[in-house]
Amino acid sequence: MKTSHYLKKASAVCMAAAMMTGCASGSSGTNGKTLTVGLNTGFNGIFSPLYYQTVYDDYVIEMVYQSMLSYDRDNQLQPELATEQPTISEDGSTLTFKLKKGVKFSDGSKLDADDVVLTFTAMADPSYTGRFSTYVDYLEGYKEYHEGDAKTLSGVEKIDDYTVAFHLATPRIDAISQVGTFP
């Protein structure tokens, strides 16, 4: 019974990841030219940000998916799907991101806080077999949710339709980067 519940949840996560393909703010940059990229090896073909394993697949992911923050040419974090840098609570235990409005998935549905919560909750799920559980294992409630003792991951909170808070159980110097740059 429990396995069936997790399989349903994993299927929902995979569908959400597939819907993230083409997530963009609506502007398009078509100039009619072709970009040719040379690689010394082939792709594995796993283009899900939750499950890819090679840098070559990541090259494709970086061109298709966006994150709340991204690095600019000077290696500084800049808002991408977020409207601004996250706010940090006085004690450093909560990071709050505000999402841009009007961002749509390739199917036309809007990106909102529920999508962010779903993505990070998926990485904490016991059935998750990808390699990014370290992106959430320092959030409040991770252990309880991962072990099936809680129904939700309390460390990821929807504040409103376009605001998400991440509550850290353990301090992490790289928390803004890890949370902010994950697609």
Question: Which functions belong to the PLM regions below?
Answer:
Residues 1-35, 76:
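Short, low-complexity disordered leader/linker segments with a strong preference
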Residues 31-41, 94-97, 116-119, 164-166:
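Short, well-ordered beta-strand elements
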Residues 32-34, 63, 80-82, 90-94, ...:
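Extracytoplasmic
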Residues 38-90:
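N-terminal lobe/hinge region of extracytoplasmic solute-binding protein
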Residues 41-45, 75, 102-104, 123, ...:
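Solvent-exposed loop/turn segments at secondary-structure junctions
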Residues 59-63, 67, 72, 76, ...:
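Extracytoplasmic/secreted proteins, especially bacterial periplasmic and envelope-associated proteins
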Residues 84-135:
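Aromatic- and charge-enriched surface segment that lines or borders ligand/interaction sites
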Residues 98, 133-183:
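Surface-exposed binding/hinge segments that line
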